[in-house]
Structures are given as structure tokens and as C-alpha cells.
């Protein structure tokens, strides 16, 4: 039986998603636990695949993995989450034998969290319009030989939440560092460093120097969408995950308040 799992993880605790020798990665930890519980024995035989190989520091609330197993009853959120740290199983689905979480994806949604450093949100939103549609993103990505640079952005939504600006980007597929380089452009537009015309030119012509990618820690792979795949949710497991998220939220919020007071006092 082939099983797909929807997963969340704190990317700051890992050296990226993809397995690397002697480094803690999301894929490596998942495979280790799946083998430990006897859910899979061999990675190749299990045809283990992931939807997105997120970079070091990038987190996820909706990445997806899939594998073949003779013990699907053990691939449950409450069982797996007990053995995982900084990774959480949020849903499970039985999928066709040829299901590949990357190639079957209908869309991917990313969220980036920007601290408002005097950013003009109206200018940022206007700049976002330039990225919509189908473009050559060579100037906004770290290119790989085997991947074509043309991609399509379905939508970019921008909304403020206190001192944080959230940018949500949706497309079918993304190039390496593409999302984070788009974010850099949007931020610079919002700060008045770049104009919409500059961005439009970069989408049409090659440039000598590319914009750097925005820091990975503020990027979240929010969702990977599929046609006809419905993930079952274990309510008990989700409640445990929410409690853990709440504890982390309290910790970071308190630390944020301390740092704010230090800044005010100095």
C-alpha cells in the first residue's frame, strides 16, 4: 500500500529537507523513524519521495511525503509523532501506487514573514503584481542545468499583522531560491530602493548581479495541493501538536518581550 503523509517541521532545527551524510535533515529523521518502527525497510523499495526539498532553515506546515509499506496501520500520526522531534505528522492518505508528491502537486503555497522596517505596503503590493503570470525567473533563482527557468505565479497576497507583513505566494512549481529572491525584490520595492520598472526589466533581460535571497528562517511551505487526495486528520494527534505549538509560541513571545525591553532600556 502507498501512503502519503502531510508533515510540518521547524526548519531552523535541520540542515534542509534532503538527506545529507552526518547531518540532521528532515528526510533523514523521517526515514530513521519509519525504519525503526518497521514501516519501511529499504528507501528505494519503499519508493520514498517528498513534495519539496526545502532549504536549510525553511519550515513547513504542509509538505508531503509518500512511501510504500506493508504496515500502513503503524503509519499513524500519534505513533510517529511520539518518535519525532521538531517534525509533526498532520494527516494521512492512501494514494495510488504511482503517486509522486512532487509531480502530482497541483500547486504550492509559501508564506514569508517580513518585519516592517518602514516598508510601504502599497508599493510592495504594486510590485507584486509584476510577478504574476508566466515569466522567465532566471534573475530570481539559483539556476540548475536540468530545470527550465520559466515558471508561473498564480497569486501573491500581502497582509499586515501588527509589525509583521505576510506575503503569500502561490504557483505550481518554484525554482531553487526563487521565492526568497522574489521576497527580496518586494521588500526593496517597499523600501523605495527598487521600482516596478526595475522588476519588470529583470523579468525580461539578464542582469549581471542578481538580488540575494531573503533569509530562509522566515519562509514556510504552507501547503501543497492535490486533486482528489484527501488527508485524514487524527484529532487527538492534532491536539497534542497544537499544545506543543502553543508552548513554543509562549516561549518565543516572552523572549520577544524581553528583547524589546532591552532595546528600550539601552
Curated annotation (Swiss-Prot):
A molecular function (GO) term? RNA binding
Q: What is its EC number?
A: 5.4.99.12
Pfam families referenced in this protein's UniProt entry, alphabetically:
PseudoU_synth_1
Its domain of life reads Archaea
Positions that bind substrate = 110
| Keyword terms, alphabetized | Isomerase, tRNA processing
What biological process terms from GO does the record include? tRNA pseudouridine synthesis
UniProt-annotated catalytic positions: 55 (nucleophile)
Task performed by this protein: Formation of pseudouridine at positions 38, 39 and 40 in the anticodon stem and loop of transfer RNAs.
Q: What is this protein called?
A: tRNA pseudouridine synthase A
Amino acid at each position: 500500500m502507498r501512503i502519503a503523509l502531510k508533515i510540518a517541521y521547524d526548519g531552523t532545527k535541520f540542515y534542509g529537507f534532503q538527506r545529507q551524510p552526518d547531518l540532521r535533515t528532515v528526510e533523514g529523521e523521517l526515514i530513521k523513524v519509519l525504519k525503526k518502527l518497521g514501516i519501511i525497510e529499504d528507501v528505494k523499495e519503499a519508493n520514498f519521495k517528498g513534495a519539496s526539498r526545502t532549504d536549510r532553515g525553511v519550515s513547513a506546515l504542509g509538505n508531503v511525503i509518500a512511501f510504500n509499506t506493508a504496515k500502513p496501520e503503524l503509519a499513524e500520526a500519534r505513533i510517529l509523532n511520539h518518535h519525532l522531534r521538531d517534525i509533526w505528522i498532520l494527516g494521512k492518505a492512501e494514494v495510488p501506487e504511482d503517486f509522486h508528491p512532487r509531480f502530482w502537486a497541483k500547486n504550492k503555497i509559501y508564506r514569508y514573514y517580513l518585519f516592517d522596517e518602514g516598508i510601504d505596503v502599497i508599493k510592495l503590493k504594486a510590485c507584486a503584481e509584476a510577478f504574476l503570470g508566466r515569466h522567465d525567473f532566471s534573475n530570481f533563482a539559483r539556476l540548475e542545468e536540468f530545470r527550465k527557468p520559466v515558471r508561473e505565479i498564480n497569486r501573491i497576497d500581502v497582509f499586515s499583522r501588527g509589525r509583521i507583513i505576510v506575503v503569500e505566494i502561490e504557483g505550481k512549481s518554484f525554482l531553487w531560491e526563487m521565492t526568497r529572491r522574489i521576497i527580496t525584490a518586494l521588500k526593496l520595492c517597499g523600501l523605495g530602493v527598487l521600482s516596478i520598472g526595475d522588476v519588470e526589466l529583470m523579468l525580461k533581460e539578464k542582469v549581471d548581479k542578481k538580488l540575494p535571497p531573503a533569509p530562509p528562517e522566515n519562509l514556510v511551505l504552507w501547503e501543497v495541493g492535490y486533486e482528489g487526495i484527501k488527508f485524514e486528520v487524527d484529532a487527538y494527534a492534532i491536539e497534542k501538536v497544537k499544545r506543543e505549538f502553543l508552548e513554543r509560541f509562549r516561549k518565543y513571545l516572552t523572549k520577544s518581550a524581553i528583547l524589546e525591553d532591552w532595546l528600550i532600556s539601552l
